[in-house]
Curated annotation (Swiss-Prot):
Source organism per UniProt: Clostridium beijerinckii (strain ATCC 51743 / NCIMB 8052)
Record flagged with keyword Transferase: yes
Catalytic activity from the UniProt record: (2S)-2-hydroxy-3-oxobutyl phosphate + 5-amino-6-(D-ribitylamino)uracil = 6,7-dimethyl-8-(1-D-ribityl)lumazine + phosphate + 2 H2O + H(+)
This protein's pathway: Cofactor biosynthesis; riboflavin biosynthesis; riboflavin from 2-hydroxy-3-oxobutyl phosphate and 5-amino-6-(D-ribitylamino)uracil: step 1/2
Protein name: 6,7-dimethyl-8-ribityllumazine synthase
Enzyme class: transferase
Top-level taxon of the source organism: Bacteria
NCBIfam families assigned to the protein according to its UniProt record, in alphabetical order: lumazine-synth, PRK00061.1-4
GO process terms (BP): riboflavin biosynthetic process
UniProt keyword annotation of S-adenosyl-L-methionine present: no
Amino acid sequence: MNIFEGNLVSEGLKFGIVVGRFNEFIGGKLLEGAIDGLKRHGVKEEDIDIAWVPGAFEIPLIAKKMAKSPKYDGVICLGAVIKGSTSHYDYVCSEVSKGIASVSLESGKPVIFGVLTTNTIEQAIERAGTKAGNKGYESAVSAIEMANLLNTIG
């Protein structure tokens, strides 16, 4: 029996990060967490590229462009969609999650869903570096682990 697991050694790995600018205060905190997570695990600053997009809905397209590039071992998608009084929230959340999953499956690379989908701004703030941790950091660690797991499996 073979058991495969990814590790958190990231020397030589390169990552793209796509961040939605809408709710930029939250996206910026998630980005800080992701960069911190990558650097703490050995990714060099020059091996991190960041693309800002207008909002969460635009994330999958740029994630796809990065994932198709041989330059990147993985892509981290960050942003925040906060529920409002209309059904727009439901459509955006659904399409962003489907789009990111599709990019990962099509590219064969880890494309990590680090987009917060919350009912309130307070919930988003909690998940962007306060009492619920930083989902950007967690997404970066997931990207490292998945990139290594894919490399291990071959």
